[in-house]
């Protein structure tokens, strides 16, 4: 690649204004969206009393070239730390001031966890956004329906499905630069490519997809003359579906996901210590699933069953012993969620279900060997949700779950969620109070610092807000305030005198509160404005890498066969902490606020056959930090082409 690559990107954006004069055939987005996250069954968003952000297939298409982390980072109340860093940088999911352990991630109704992880958290880097059809982000404590970890929110991902045509497919290639603020290379060092084959007929559907990503050209750590790190990902997915009649259907799937990356050390006050040529990681995941569904006169019955294995091999430099140490982890998970919706009337239905989950892990490293004969537990959680949708405008969602854990016993969580739609006003008022739990991980129970006496963390969230549709439903505004409390968090104890260390349950209460506002305005059938603002205030102990203020603004111009989008983001200053090797103590620092501007242009050169897009990220080449001591991306260019057949 040479300077022609940059020129093509800029030229494509410039030509958008000439194409924009073509006649428009797109209609205003249907504001009566269907959501599934708050009941596990489809219902009108108007009848939902929860704060659910929906990212549709169309909106994902308008964000071509962005990663899953980039897309989620633009949602009100969601902070994905590391999304602007090098592609292999580990990610932090901070919803409403929470942490990774407090976010539940589901794909097609099946929970994703790494049973060998410190907090049972899942690595979002394993997921390719090119496999995704739709994302729902439901904020607030949601353990009643989603179990452990659903304390601050649920990221509910739906993968692409087979179309009704007998056969079709697509193939794509995307080339991008990989620059920091200090570099301006035009060489393509971020390469994405893949294909998809799918179709349906004679009651059978199928899908095969392969996606890959290779990134290099940046050091993960910030410093002069540091070696370049690398990141690669491969995703393979196979789906089969069968629908013998209108009432019964099922789907089976299998996936293989792999990431390989090199990484650097955390900042310790000495910049030269950050760069490390020996640190490397390999993560491999295999998932299988079975999803039957049966519809009858008064309801539906479904099972979401899946199993996964995640293996991680980590190589790190041991500066104390001057050796290279190897760490091997394997985590296995089995999940089966059987649930039934029964409608008593058109206004009243109940969801009854039971979720079973099994976890085990193996750990082999220089400090410990942990066998899955010991490191294992299971959960059996029956739950119920009652939903009442009155014709007078009152909606009520009541639910409860009994968490039964093989180690620590039982725990009850619940939710109360009323909402009211005014008949003569364009206004819906929502309120909720819900609780959640986070089970201790296998590592925290049985690892080298394990403590089998740990009890689950408890969370509770109270919300109050409204949604209004004005100007003939062209303008939608929703605002919600929240107050969140967490108790019995799991922490790490270290005795400097005896060098004894282990995990403990911290008795105490930490809180977070805030405000989230989202606005969508359809100026015309062609032009849409979307914006959001988030205010988050947390207790001092929680205040790391959490911006107090954050805002996003996006403008989309749709025209015949194309789309032009501009995105602006403001992220307030944040507090970061690090262990300073110079003074042997923890230090605190402030990271400055930053602003980003991105643009994307896409166009169908051949209708339903050939699409092209170009994107420029960090247009102003803003210098900023997400985490102290780590690089972030400067101005970069992407150019992509998709073939449809």
Label the predicted regions.
Residues 33, 68-71, 91-94, 106, ...:
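N-terminal periplasmic accessory domains that precede
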Residues 203-207, 247-250, 298-302, 347-350, ...:
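Repeated loop/turn-to-beta-strand initiation elements of outer-membrane beta-barrel proteins
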Residues 69, 73-111:
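Extracytoplasmic beta-strand/coil segments of soluble accessory domains associated
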Residues 172, 389-396, 483-485, 505-579, ...:
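Gram-negative outer-membrane beta-barrel transporters
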Residues 273-291, 417, 427-428, 432-487, ...:
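Outer-membrane beta-barrel signature, preferentially recognizing the C-terminal barrel domain
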Residues 22, 215-237, 241-301, 305-333:
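Flexible loop and strand-edge segments within Gram-negative outer membrane beta-barrel domains
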Residues 33-63, 92:
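N-terminal periplasmic "start-of-domain" segments of outer-membrane beta-barrel proteins
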Residues 111-139:
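Short acidic/polar hinge/loop motifs at secondary-structure boundaries
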């Amino acid at each position: 690649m040479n300077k022609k690559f940059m020129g093509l990107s800029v030229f494509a954006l410039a030509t958008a204004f000439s194409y924009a004069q073509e006649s428009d055939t797109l209609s205003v987005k249907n504001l009566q969206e269907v959501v599934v996250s708050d009941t596990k069954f489809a219902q009108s968003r108007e009848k939902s009393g929860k704060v659910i952000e929906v990212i549709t297939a169309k909106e994902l298409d308008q964000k071509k070239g962005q990663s899953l982390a980039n897309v989620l980072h633009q949602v009100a109340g969601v902070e994905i730390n590391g999304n602007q860093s090098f592609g292999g940088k580990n990610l932090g999911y901070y919803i409403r001031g929470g942490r990774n352990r407090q976010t539940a991630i589901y794909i097609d109704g099946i929970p994703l966890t790494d049973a060998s992880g410190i907090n049972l958290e899942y690595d979002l880097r394993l997921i390719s956004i090119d496999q995704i059809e739709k994302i729902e982000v439901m904020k607030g404590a949601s353990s009643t329906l989603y179990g452990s970890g659903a304390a601050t929110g649920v990221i509910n991902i739906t993968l692409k499905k087979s179309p009704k045509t007998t056969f079709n497919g697509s193939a794509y290639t995307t080339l991008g630069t990989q620059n920091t603020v200090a570099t301006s290379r035009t060489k393509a060092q971020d390469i994405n490519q893949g294909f998809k084959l799918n179709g349906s007929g004679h009651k059978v559907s199928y899908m095969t997809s392969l996606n890959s990503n290779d990134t290099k050209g940046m050091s993960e750590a910030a410093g002069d003359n540091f070696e370049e790190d690398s990141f690669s990902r491969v995703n393979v997915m196979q789906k089969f579906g069968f629908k013998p009649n209108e009432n019964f259907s099922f789907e089976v799937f299998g996936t293989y996901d792999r990431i390989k990356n090199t990484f650097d050390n955390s900042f310790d006050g000495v910049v030269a210590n950050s760069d490390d040529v020996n640190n490397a990681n390999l993560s491999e995941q295999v998932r299988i699933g079975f999803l039957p569904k049966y519809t009858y006169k008064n309801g539906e019955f479904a099972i979401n069953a899946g199993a996964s294995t995640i293996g991680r091999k980590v190589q790190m430099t041991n500066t104390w012993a001057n050796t290279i140490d190897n760490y091997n982890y394997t985590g296995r998970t089995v999940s089966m969620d059987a649930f039934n919706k029964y409608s008593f009337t058109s206004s009243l239905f109940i969801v009854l279900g039971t979720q079973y989950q099994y976890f085990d892990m193996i750990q082999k490293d220089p400090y410990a060997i942990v066998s899955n004969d010991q490191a294992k537990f299971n959960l059996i959680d029956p739950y119920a949700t009652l939903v009442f949708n009155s014709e007078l405008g009152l909606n009520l969602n009541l639910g409860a779950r009994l968490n039964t854990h093989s180690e620590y016993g039982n725990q009850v969580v619940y939710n109360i969620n009323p909402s009211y739609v005014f008949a003569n006003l364009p206004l819906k008022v929502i309120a909720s109070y819900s609780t959640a739990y986070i089970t201790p991980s296998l590592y925290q129970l049985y690892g080298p610092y394990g403590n089998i006496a740990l009890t689950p963390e408890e969370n509770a969230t109270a919300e109050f807000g409204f949604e209004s549709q004005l100007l003939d439903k062209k303008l939608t505004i929703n605002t919600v305030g929240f107050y969140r409390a967490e108790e019995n968090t799991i922490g790490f104890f270290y005795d400097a005198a005896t060098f004894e260390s282990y995990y403990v349950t911290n008795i105490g209460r930490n809180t977070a509160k805030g405000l989230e506002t989202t606005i969508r305005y359809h100026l015309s059938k062609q032009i849409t404005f979307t914006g959001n603002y988030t205010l988050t205030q947390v207790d001092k102990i929680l205040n790391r890498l959490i911006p107090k203020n954050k805002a996003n603004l996006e403008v989309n111009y749709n025209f015949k066969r194309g789309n032009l989008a501009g995105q602006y983001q403001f992220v307030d200053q944040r507090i970061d902490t690090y262990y300073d090797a110079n003074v042997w103590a923890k230090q605190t620092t402030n990271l400055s606020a930053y602003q980003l501007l991105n643009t994307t242009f896409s166009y169908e050169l051949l209708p339903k056959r050939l699409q092209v897009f170009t994107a420029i990220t960090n247009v102003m080449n803003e210098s900023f930090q997400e985490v102290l001591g780590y690089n972030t991306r400067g101005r970069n260019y992407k150019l992509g082409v998709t073939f449809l057949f």
